[in-house]
Amino acid sequence: MPEAGAIRPDATVLGFDVGSRRIGVAVGTALGAGARAVAVINVHANGPDWVALDRVHKEWRPAGLVVGDPLTLDDKDQPARKRAHAFARELRERYALPVVLIDERSSSVEAAQRFARERADGRKRRRDADTLDAMAAAVIVERWLSAPEQATLLP
């Protein structure tokens, strides 16, 4: 299995903001203009919509995957963190790509602020949870792009 360092800094990556009902997905590369939101994947009682995830994976052909690590302010475990780590392990097994975790604290707040700016500029028309999930994934990818050394290996 590839290690975290195996993700080339100039490679295309997919990033994920894992929630209990939706998973925001973004794509990014250091050679491009940062990251952009690309999809929201529904999570059902039996897990994520893997058919939809397979389509996104096939379309973007990433060299690595970046999953948001929902740490608490005091770095304690919580159900959301366990869910994100389980999803990251599934990604690694399914796609045989390097998977890293990056601190996602405040990514949803940052995504909401970006959304508000875009709405004020007339680029967004209404608040949409799906858009925010994917925008939060873009924030996660941008954090990895700006500081890949802060990523951690999947335990």
Swiss-Prot record:
Write out the annotated subcellular location. Answer: Cytoplasm
Main subcellular localization, coarse class?
cytoplasm
What domain of life?
Answer: Bacteria
Short name of any one Pfam family annotated for the protein: RuvX
What GO molecular-function term can you cite, just one? nuclease activity
Q: GO cellular-component terms in the record?
A: cytoplasm
Q: Which residues form a coiled coil?
A: none
Give the record's keywords alphabetically: Cytoplasm, Hydrolase, Nuclease, Ribosome biogenesis
Listed Gene3D superfamilies: YqgF/RNase H-like domain (3.30.420.140)
Q: What is its EC number?
A: 3.1.-.-
Give the GO terms filed under biological process for this record.
rRNA 5'-end processing
Q: Which residues form the signal peptide?
A: none
HAMAP family for this protein: Nuclease_YqgF
Family that this chain belongs to = Belongs to the YqgF nuclease family.
* Function, as annotated: Could be a nuclease involved in processing of the 5'-end of pre-16S rRNA.
- NCBIfam families from the xrefs? RNAse_H_YqgF
Q: What protein name applies here?
A: Putative pre-16S rRNA nuclease
Please name the source species: Xanthomonas campestris pv. campestris (strain ATCC 33913 / DSM 3586 / NCPPB 528 / LMG 568 / P 25)
